Amino acid sequence: MKINREQVEHVARLARLALSEDELASLTDDMDAILGYVEKLNELDTDHIIPTAHAVPVENAFREDCAGSSIGTDKALQNAPEASDNCFVVPKVIE
């Protein structure tokens, strides 16, 4: 599959990117090369390969979730610029 300039312009519009002529030309070449590599992968014989989620075995490396002591509400709110009903008051960011 060959990537053309119109497809790169379309992707740029979807991503809301303003690209210069040089950037469009460069990205067209780059994206075309990337798809060429993907097409090369399609040539591999994977009939005897078991599908996996990870290339290597993965183990959960997280620690056990244990509740510990905390500093308490009063101390946490002590340096807050503003608090109400034991909660931090922050500026509204969503209408």
UniProtKB/Swiss-Prot annotation:
- Enzyme class comes to ligase
Looking up PANTHER family in the UniProt record yields:
GLUTAMYL-TRNA(GLN) AMIDOTRANSFERASE SUBUNIT C, MITOCHONDRIAL
- Upper taxonomic lineage: Bacteria, Pseudomonadati, Thermodesulfobacteriota, Desulfuromonadia, Desulfuromonadales
* This protein's name: Aspartyl/glutamyl-tRNA(Asn/Gln) amidotransferase subunit C
E.C. no = 6.3.5.-
Q: Which family does it belong to?
A: Belongs to the GatC family.
- Is the keyword Protein biosynthesis in the record? yes
Q: Which organism is it from?
A: Syntrophotalea carbinolica (strain DSM 2380 / NBRC 103641 / GraBd1) (Pelobacter carbinolicus)
Q: Which domain of life is it from?
A: Bacteria
Subunit description: Heterotrimer of A, B and C subunits.
Q: Is the keyword Repressor assigned to this protein?
A: no
Functional summary from the UniProt entry: Allows the formation of correctly charged Asn-tRNA(Asn) or Gln-tRNA(Gln) through the transamidation of misacylated Asp-tRNA(Asn) or Glu-tRNA(Gln) in organisms which lack either or both of asparaginyl-tRNA or glutaminyl-tRNA synthetases. The reaction takes place in the presence of glutamine and ATP through an activated phospho-Asp-tRNA(Asn) or phospho-Glu-tRNA(Gln).
